[in-house]
Amino acid sequence: MIQTQSIVDVADNSGARRVMCIKVLGGSKRRYANIGDVIKVSIKEAIPRGKVKKGDVMHAVVVRTRKGVRRNDGSLIRFDNNAVVLLNNQLQLVGTRVFGPVVRELRTDKFMKIISLALEVL
């Protein structure tokens, strides 16, 4: 579960390394974001010559959480870290690669590109 002020890792090659959640989108009183939710983030750490720079405010979709996701068969898939993939204002991916595993629950019309770019889909 990601909330405001949470520091999370970036799982793409956009140039950002760590970002901070500044807003969970989807309602005025919404507090937590789970896998597949869109959040507003601020870049806190970035590499030189990347596509984004420190201080940029962007959208991001949550692809991994330590809380995990519960499947219909009762299984729970958890990860070692919280990670997001950066999006632009039109909710298109900024990077061209996705690192680490992602879950099948991202398989919606909006985020099918993340599934196709990911090396491992659980």
Curated annotation (Swiss-Prot):
The keyword Zinc does not apply. Disulfide bonds: none annotated. It holds the Pfam family Ribosomal_L14. The keyword RNA-binding applies. Keywords: Ribonucleoprotein, Ribosomal protein, RNA-binding, rRNA-binding. NCBIfam families: rplN_bact. This is Large ribosomal subunit protein uL14. It comes from Coxiella burnetii (strain RSA 493 / Nine Mile phase I). The gene is rplN.
